[in-house]
């Protein structure tokens, strides 16, 4: 995607700035860009499975080297937050690799500038989606896991429930043993 977009963008406007984005746990293109040659990573670790590659394509690397002005990385946590934002605020499902550009925006200092952020792909299974939403809610302090040791007598759990209700809290799941 970066090869085609950057090549076309530079053909249309040679002065345009094109920045590539990779997951921090799979930054083979960034390393290759820095080294000036195709570089293989020892391993990759990212939730962005569509971009989780150890070695960039040798055929596309010359175009990337020529047409990208920079390559930055984003952490998986930033992808999780971007996914939650897209679902809640824009009602869009975009796979983790397709959200790299959205997650990168906060690193670029582009306020009051014209920016195009390309979103691609919606290939995400529901189990992964559920996990990403859950993690996003945790990162935003919207859900918590709490363990409480209560005396074994009537009314104790009701007191905890009332305390939560007093602060507009809700119980999603309760385990008792």
What are the residue ranges of the model-derived segments?
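Active-site loop ensemble at the mouth of alpha/beta enzyme cores that anchors a bound cofactor
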Residues: 41, 61, 110-112, 118, ...
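Active-site-adjacent helical/loop segments in soluble small-molecule enzymes
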Residues: 57-113, 172
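Residues at the starts of beta-strands that form the adenosine-phosphate
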Residues: 15-17, 114, 170
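A conserved regulatory-domain signal marking ACT and ACT-like small-molecule sensing domains
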Residues: 129-177
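Short glycine/serine/threonine-rich phosphate/pyrophosphate-binding segments
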Residues: 1-6, 26-30, 97-105, 118, ...
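Short, well-ordered alpha-helices that flank and scaffold nucleotide-derived cofactor binding pockets
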Residues: 7-11, 31, 106-107, 162
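Small/polar-residue-rich loop-to-helix segments that shape phosphate-bearing ligand pockets
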Residues: 9, 13-17, 22-79, 91
């Amino acid at each position: 995607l970066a090869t085609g977009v950057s090549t076309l963008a530079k053909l249309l406007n040679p002065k345009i700035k094109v920045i590539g984005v990779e997951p921090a746990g799979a930054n083979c293109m960034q390393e290759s860009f820095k080294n000036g040659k195709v570089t293989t990573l020892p391993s990759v670790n990212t939730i962005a499975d569509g971009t989780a590659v150890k070695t960039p394509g040798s055929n596309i690397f010359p175009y990337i080297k020529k047409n990208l002005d920079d390559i930055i990385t984003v952490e998986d946590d930033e992808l999780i937050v971007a996914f939650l934002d897209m679902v809640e605020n824009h009602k869009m499902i975009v796979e983790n690799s397709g959200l790299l550009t959205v997650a990168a925006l906060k690193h670029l200092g582009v306020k009051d500038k014209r920016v195009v952020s390309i979103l691609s792909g919606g290939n995400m299974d529901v189990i992964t989606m559920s996990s990403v939403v859950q993690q996003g809610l945790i990162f935003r302090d919207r859900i918590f896991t709490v363990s409480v040791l209560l005396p074994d007598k009537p009314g104790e759990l009701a007191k905890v429930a009332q305390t939560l209700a007093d602060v507009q809290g809700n119980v999603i799941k309760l385990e008792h043993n």
